[in-house]
Amino acid sequence: MISQETLLKQAEEVKDSVILHRRKIHRYAEIGGKEYKTHKYICEFIEKLGLPYENVTETAILATLDTGKPGPHIALRADIDALPLKENPDNLCGPRTCISEQEGTCHACGHDAHAAMLMGCMEVFCNLKDSLSGVIYFCFEAGEENGASHLQMLDALGRRSVDTVWAIHVYAALESGKIGIRTGACMAGFGGIDITVHGKSGHGSRPDRAINPVYVAA
């Protein structure tokens, strides 16, 4: 059993590198499915840690830490794509520490932080490998905003024995140092539904005998 003190110590040791990861990925800021610089940067870090990985799509990555001991198989997931938005060089407190270098694209939804935290988590678990059991999968999902890789990632995990999947999302409304967790849905996510609306034609003078599908669809 790894103590909380040990985990906090490890987290503190990788803090600076996590900040560096976040700033680098923030500057890259690439649209879903085209996160080429981000993909290269993450893969180089995974290789530095000596972990095997699979390119699930051109830019989505699934890395594996196998402790060699029986135990749960856990997947940890982070998204890595940015949004097609122009970034303001200033925030409410003053100039930003770093801004996107890609015109018209920026990390406005925190995916740079998600990826950086998962990279830090990966480093911590590699350092503590001898004290762990089971298998940990690190999922770097490309194109969360446009669905560029979620089906392929699910398929890749489906070909493995996975007991549980964990993911996080930054949330500015929470006080620093706290996390929010709840049963059921917590935030909106990428997805869609199809509906078919059946209208009924009629004369403009007798709308009461018609069914206007525009109102229903709206």
Set out the residue ranges of the language-model regions.
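Acidic/His- and Gly-rich active-site-bordering loop/insert found
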Residues: 2-107, 112-120, 124-133
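Histidine/acidic-residue-rich, glycine-tolerant segments that coordinate divalent metal ions
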Residues: 83-85, 96-106, 112-113, 128-218
